[in-house]
């Protein structure tokens, strides 16, 4: 096995039974690939595929002017380099974007000969700014990181459904069909309770479907021929004869005696015709059956019947036959007659009945009827009618089925080919109606809307493309109007195209769309989950109110595609989902999941991705099926799935097998160990709460994990990976310099990688992002190794919480109802201390009365308040501040006091500005204490920078220069090494220090020279001389390149900042706030076991073990049985074993046991069960490092659905606690419980207690952020009642029920106070305030404002109401 540099330092013992060769794919690949497809930035212009921007351009262009004399064509587009990098955009509040320029060609034709080209103009046109995706799949919009969530919407195509009997009181199923395009009008077909078929366009008024059939060019005869089989009759003088078709007679009631051709009665009247009768008729070789007139009456004529002599139409298609009609036909000598065949069972007369309700005569009349429905009130001219009908379904500009839609339509209508036109054809409409009629006749099944074959995912790229198209279509309309003037006014393409609509459409989408969300950045897991989220909400999707139970439910096709566990609780449940671990999108946007191929019950390594539609055809076994040594399925019957049903089949019938047991869950759920032992509801809470864990100051890897911790940490982008292999040259807290291996450097590029670490940076949720190096100078790393840890990661593994020793027992009521009792030792060790970074900003504006000024010179401020400010009036970095302290001094001009004429004159003479200023400094908000860690000053172009701003720029430049110098140092070092090798032993023609001609160059000589003088040595060999020259010029070129880069950086930093209108200067101050654990903070395990800290007890009061160690946390045992999350108990036991093994290794290291013994113990641990680790290949030094890292505990991986068994946990506990240790600790024989003692009395508790180690998280619901109190504050405008909520500095609502409580106590004065002076009696509350200030404590309650509001409300209804005063 290959271990990376960091993996080797601490190997996780895995209990996985199944070796999974299929790696978990890159977790944010869907986002990155989708946007890369949209931009196609790395492809040359001419070889771009028609998708994304390219598709939008090609669909909008060419644009032809209305008169046809000018035409604009699209050639290609290109994206420029972004002006600022991601970090600069975040600091300055810019959008990380690239400018889009399109090359466009304007062709003007000759008016005399319209085919002749008069002139062609080509130019590049600016098309707006396109935001770029960062390498981690997010966007920086106005300085904040955002994520575009993928949307799950109904796939375009044709769908058949019924109303489940809800519409009509009889419970009759009403069938309907709907053709949904990607863009354009929806076409619905539906039956009503009387079995008449209607259609509607875009949910408008319904009309009989035959109007549409006539509009597409069918007449009544053709309509009937398309939907019915015909019965053929020959008329005789009385009665007639019917062609004998056996299958149409079976099951009918004979209403006359049926005779065979010999005149023998085969079926008597009023008998039901059965198979025996049919056989008898066939045996008698019956071709026709004689029928009486009664049998013909009431049937429906299939074709127009024309009198052969006069040409008069005697009967129209769809007329019913009457006795009179039969007489007329006989008189006219008509011998043959065709009627439509219908019966009540499987061929109803629906279309025939619909045709009777339809009053339109021909195609034009039908189209006019459709026009009147779509455009009521407009006069239908022939051209307008024709144009509208074409635009509805047949025009590529207005109607687009898309490739997906065409594929879905063709497959649903059972056609062999999957390609076709992107607009509707008459066949599509006809086949859809036929299928719907078949459904009504009992043939076929309705579609399942929630099947993942009928719902597809729209990713970032597609959503952005749709917005771009919308913007482009607005541009197109404007260009079309102006193209006519292009020739007369000699305009260029860029004069015609205005890119504003495109920019605004894109900006609106990224800035304020429902799917563009503020990135959840609490910890790395929440980041990665947010990017893998799939929402059914948003434009073109569902709404919370309309979504029923079915849409939200878990569907069998979710298996391996969408996680059944991870979804929010509350109104969005089931509408927002997470992508499963291995799922990906196919070219059509449907979710696929991988399976390994099985042939003849042998499992191969070939992996096939199947979509939900394809999967239904196969029998698929689960990943935990038993496989023998030769790779064959071993059991006689294997549990498998087929079309969503679970079945037991023989191994030969299996087509595929799952790639991994964790295939069905998402990233967050797959991090929960023993997930298989938790109840679904609690598993959901566990997965959701992991995303709210606050990064701790000292991250601690979970002792019991699932093996995915490393994958999630690496894919989230929080850790730094080596982009190329090499040797670590230099490390400090801020940067890592790696000298790259020669074979990984391309010719002419710098063989050095510099990684600048992110230090104490604020995340979107105000948590702290900080990276720490985990390599040392001299370490050799390979590509992809972790070189620095980020927030919530420990040695490249995700570490969301801390490993706590827990005991399950009640403790004096302090863990009643999920409360948590915690030891003071945990707080003292800073285990759960987290740093939160607050950004506070202040702006100086130009006001009517003059400019605001940022200054230290503020009157009426004590020197103690100013002591932390520098001469520019900005706080120093490192200052410790608390609520009310000034961070940035600022003064604002105040309105002039009225001046006497004399003063005015003096002001006018001496030109003094307003002297009155008020103090509007930035102060620390209430309830906040912290340290200033960073200050940023932004100054508008043209305004002089203050000393502080210049100092910040200098510092930034110095840091940049340091990076360049490092690169140069390594480049020059390499060059001089090559030069030395080149020169030593060569003969010189001369050189510095009067080197004689013909002397051999040696090491001593070179050492005596300054390195830069080596180039002055003149080698005798011409070739060597050229090589020396080449090295010299390459160094000079690099120097020049670095100097240019430095100058570019300087220009960027010194140019003015782009601030809002009227703002001259902006200062941002960053405060680091340290939050220790305290009562009221919310904590949780990974199994949905959450609670609030009730008390932090002294360590000496906590229950302790026989060896004197107190436990860290005491949890209530009653929280487990009813919640059914037993996973936490198994985690506790396995964590206990992990800690015990760590103690044993620690003992071995301290006693300095022999390497062989240590190796033997490690092999016993790693290789008895589960995955085999390659311990033999470790060097002694690596074993020492490994053992050092295992002293805190041996980390376990128990993968989801493939984890440790009870026997394995038991075995690990035995290895951790040998007999003598277990006895000394008073453990039960299973080592899962022990006798504890009460910390306060020292007495033993009477029963053994479950003790172990659990990974516990501190959640982002901290009491500091929630604690709030109000004295006086803002009031609502209308009701004059206090506002609510901490953000508004609101009060606590005294509601209806609270009023009842006071009424019940008879506390009338308290009640009066609550409802008047403490709430909305405006005069009363002002008076009370004044009284309190004076020291009097009296109340004058008046009329509450809300009573006046009620009176006004009643008056507005026209009822005069007045107060009676007595």
Curated annotation (Swiss-Prot):
GO CC, alphabetical: DNA-directed RNA polymerase complex
Keyword Transcription: yes
Spans traversing the lipid bilayer: none
One MF term in the entry's GO annotations: DNA-directed RNA polymerase activity
Keyword Transcription assigned: yes
Gene Ontology terms describing biological process: DNA-templated transcription
Domain of life: Bacteria
Catalytic activity: RNA(n) + a ribonucleoside 5'-triphosphate = RNA(n+1) + diphosphate
Keyword annotations from UniProtKB, A to Z: DNA-directed RNA polymerase, Nucleotidyltransferase, Transcription, Transferase
InterPro entries reported in the protein's UniProt record: DNA-dir_RNA_pol_bsu_ext_1_sf, DNA-dir_RNA_pol_bsu_external_1, DNA-dir_RNA_pol_su2, DNA-dir_RNAP_su2_dom, DNA-dir_RNAP_su2_hyb_sf, RNA_pol_bsu_bac, RNA_pol_bsu_CS, RNA_pol_bsu_protrusion
The enzyme's E.C. designation: 2.7.7.6
Family recorded in the similarity comment: Belongs to the RNA polymerase beta chain family.
Role: DNA-dependent RNA polymerase catalyzes the transcription of DNA into RNA using the four ribonucleoside triphosphates as substrates.
Assembly notes: The RNAP catalytic core consists of 2 alpha, 1 beta, 1 beta' and 1 omega subunit. When a sigma factor is associated with the core the holoenzyme is formed, which can initiate transcription.
Protein name, as recorded: DNA-directed RNA polymerase subunit beta
Species lineage: Bacteria, Pseudomonadati, Pseudomonadota, Betaproteobacteria, Burkholderiales
Originating gene: rpoB
């Amino acid at each position: 096995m290959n271990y990376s540099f960091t993996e080797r330092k601490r190997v996780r013992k895995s209990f996985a039974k199944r070796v999974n060769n299929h790696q978990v794919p890159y977790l944010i690949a869907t986002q990155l690939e989708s946007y890369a497809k949209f931009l196609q930035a790395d492809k040359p212009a001419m070889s771009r595929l028609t998708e994304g921007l390219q598709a939008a351009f090609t669909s909008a262009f060419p644009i032809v002017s209305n008169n046809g004399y000018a035409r604009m064509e699209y050639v290609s587009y290109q994206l420029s380099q972004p002006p600022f990098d991601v970090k600069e955009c975040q600091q300055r509040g810019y959008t990380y974007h690239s400018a889009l320029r399109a090359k466009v060609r304007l062709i003007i034709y000759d008016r005399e000969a319209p085919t002749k080209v008069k002139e062609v103009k080509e130019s590049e046109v600016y098309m707006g700014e396109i935001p770029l995706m960062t390498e981690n799949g997010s966007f920086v919009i106005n300085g904040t990181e955002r994520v575009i969530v993928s949307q799950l919407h109904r796939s375009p195509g044709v769908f058949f459904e019924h109303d489940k009997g809800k519409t009509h009181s009889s419970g009759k199923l009403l069938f309907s069909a709907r053709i949904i395009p990607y863009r354009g009008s929806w076409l619905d077909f539906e039956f009503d309770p009387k079995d008449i078929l209607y259609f509607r366009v875009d949910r408008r008024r319904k009309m009989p479907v035959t109007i549409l059939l006539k509009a597409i060019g069918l007449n009544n005869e053709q309509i009937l021929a398309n939907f019915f089989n015909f019965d053929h009759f020959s008329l005789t003088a009385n009665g007639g004869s019917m062609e004998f078709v056996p299958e149409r007679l079976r099951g009918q009631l004979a209403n006359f005696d049926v005779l065979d051709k010999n005149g023998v009665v085969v079926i008597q009247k009023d008998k039901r015709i059965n198979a025996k009768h049919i056989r008898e008729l066939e045996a008698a070789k019956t071709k026709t059956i004689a029928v009486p007139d009664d049998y013909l009456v009431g049937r429906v004529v299939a074709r127009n019947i024309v009198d052969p002599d006069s040409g008069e139409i005697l009967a129209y298609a769809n007329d019913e036959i009457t006795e009179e009609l039969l007489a007329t036909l006989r008189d006219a000598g008509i011998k043959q007659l065709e009627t439509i065949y219908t019966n009540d069972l499987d061929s109803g007369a629906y279309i025939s009945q619909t045709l009777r309700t339809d009053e339109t005569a021909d195609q034009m009349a039908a189209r006019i009827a459709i026009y009147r429905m779509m455009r009521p009130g407009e006069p239908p001219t022939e051209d307008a009618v024709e144009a509208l009908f074409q635009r509805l379904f047949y025009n590529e500009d207005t109607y687009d089925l898309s490739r997906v839609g065409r594929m879905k339509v063709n497959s649903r209508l059972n056609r062999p080919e999957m390609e076709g036109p992107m607009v509707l054809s008459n066949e599509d409409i006809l086949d859809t109606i036929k299928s719907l009629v078949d459904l009504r006749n009992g043939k076929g099944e309705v579609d399942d809307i929630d099947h993942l074959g009928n719902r597809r995912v729209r990713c970032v790229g597609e959503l952005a493309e749709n917005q771009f198209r919308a913007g482009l279509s607005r541009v197109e309309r404007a260009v079309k109007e102006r193209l006519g003037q292009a020739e007369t006014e000699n305009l260029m393409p860029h004069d015609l195209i205005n890119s504003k609509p495109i920019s605004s459409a894109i900006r609106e989408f990224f800035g304020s769309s429902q799917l563009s969300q503020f990135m959840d950045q609490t910890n790395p897991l929440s980041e990665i989950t947010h990017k893998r989220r799939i929402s059914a909400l948003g434009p073109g999707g569902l709404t919370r109110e309309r979504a029923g139970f079915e849409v939200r439910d878990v569907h069998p096709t979710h298996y391996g595609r969408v996680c059944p566990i991870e979804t929010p609780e509350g109104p969005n449940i089931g509408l927002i989902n997470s992508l499963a671990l291995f799922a990906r999108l196919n070219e059509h946007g449907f979710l696929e999941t991988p399976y390994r191929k099985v042939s003849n019950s042998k499992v191969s390594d070939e992996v096939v991705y199947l979509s939900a539609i394809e999967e239904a055809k196969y029998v698929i076994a689960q990943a935990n099926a038993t496989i023998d040594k030769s790779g064959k399925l071993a059991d006689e019957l294997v549990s498998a799935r087929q079309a969503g049903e679970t079945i037991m089949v023989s191994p030969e019938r299996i087509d595929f097998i799952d790639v991994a047991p964790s295939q069905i869950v998402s990233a967050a759920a797959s991090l929960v160990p023993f997930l298989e032992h938790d109840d679904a509801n609690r598993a959901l809470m566990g997965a959701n709460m992991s995303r709210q864990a606050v990064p701790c100051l000292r991250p601690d890897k979970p002792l019991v994990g699932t093996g995915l911790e490393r994958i999630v940490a690496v894919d989230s982008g929080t850790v730094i990976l080596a982009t190329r292999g090499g040797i670590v040259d230099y490390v400090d807290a801020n940067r890592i310099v790696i000298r790259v291996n020669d074979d990984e450097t391309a010719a002419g590029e710098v063989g050095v990688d510099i990684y600048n670490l992110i230090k104490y940076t604020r995340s979107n949720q105000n948590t702290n992002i900080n990276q720490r190096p985990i390599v040392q100078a001299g370490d050799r790393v390979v590509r992809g190794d972790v070189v620095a840890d980020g927030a919530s990661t420990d040695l490249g593994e995700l570490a969301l919480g801390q490993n706590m020793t827990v005991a399950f027992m009640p403790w004096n009521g302090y863990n009643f109802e999920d409360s948590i009792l915690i030891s003071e030792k945990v707080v003292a060790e800073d285990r759960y201390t987290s740093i939160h970074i607050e950004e506070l900003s202040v702006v100086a504006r130009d006001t009517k009365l003059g400019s605001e000024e940022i200054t230290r010179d503020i009157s009426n401020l004590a020197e103690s308040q100013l002591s932390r400010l520098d001469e520019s009036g900005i706080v120093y970095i490192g200052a410790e501040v608390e609520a009310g302290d000034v961070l940035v001094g600022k003064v604002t001009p105040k309105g002039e006091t009225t001046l006497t004429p004399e003063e005015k004159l003096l002001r006018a003479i001496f030109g003094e500005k307003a002297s009155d200023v008020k103090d509007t400094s930035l102060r620390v908000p209430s309830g906040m204490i912290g340290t200033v860690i960073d200050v940023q000053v932004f100054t508008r172009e043209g305004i002089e920078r203050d000393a502080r701003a210049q100092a910040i720029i200098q510092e930034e430049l110095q840091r940049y220069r340091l990076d360049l110098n490092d690169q140069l140092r390594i480049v020059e070092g390499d060059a001089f090494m090559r030069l030395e090798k080149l020169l030593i032993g060569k003969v010189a023609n001369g050189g510095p220090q009067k080197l004689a001609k013909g002397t051999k160059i040696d090491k001593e000589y070179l050492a005596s020279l300054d390195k830069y003088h080596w180039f002055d040595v003149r080698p005798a060999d011409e070739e060597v001389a050229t090589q020396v020259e080449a090295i010299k010029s390459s160094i000079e070129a690099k120097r020049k390149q670095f100097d240019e880069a430095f100058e570019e950086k300087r220009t960027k930093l010194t140019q003015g900042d782009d601030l809002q209108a009227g703002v001259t200067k902006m200062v941002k101050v960053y405060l680091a706030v340290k939050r220790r654990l305290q009562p009221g903070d919310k904590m949780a395990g990974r199994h949905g076991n959450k609670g609030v800290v009730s008390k932090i007890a002294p360590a000496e009061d906590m229950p302790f073990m026989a060896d004197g160690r107190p436990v860290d946390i005491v949890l209530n045992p009653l929280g487990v049985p009813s919640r059914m999350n037993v996973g936490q108990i198994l985690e506790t036991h396995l964590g206990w074993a992990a800690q015990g093994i760590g103690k044993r290794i620690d003992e071995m290291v301290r006693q300095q046991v022999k390497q062989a013994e240590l190796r033997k113990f490690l092999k016993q641990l790693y290789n008895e069960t589960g995955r085999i680790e390659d311990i033999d290949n470790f060097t002694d030094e690596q074993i020492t490092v490994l053992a050092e890292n295992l002293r805190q505990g041996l980390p376990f991986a128990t993968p989801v659905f493939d984890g440790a068994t009870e026997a394995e946990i038991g075995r690990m506990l035995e290895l951790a606690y040998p007999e003598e240790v277990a006895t000394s600790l008073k453990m039960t024989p299973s080592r899962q419980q022990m006798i504890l003692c009460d910390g306060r009395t020292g007495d033993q508790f009477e029963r053994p207690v479950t003790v172990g180690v659990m990974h516990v998280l501190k959640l982002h619901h901290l009491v500091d952020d929630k604690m709030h109190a109000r004295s006086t504050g803002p009031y609502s405008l209308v009701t004059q009642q206090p506002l609510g909520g901490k953000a508004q500095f609101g009060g606590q609502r005294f509601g209806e029920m609270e009023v009842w409580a006071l009424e019940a106590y008879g506390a009338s004065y308290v009640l009066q106070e609550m409802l008047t002076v403490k709430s909305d009696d405006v005069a009363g509350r002002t008076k009370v305030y004044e009284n309190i200030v004076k020291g009097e404590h009296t109340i004058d309650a008046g009329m509450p404002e809300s009573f006046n509001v009620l009176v006004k409300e009643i008056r507005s209804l026209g009822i005069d109401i007045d107060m009676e005063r007595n």
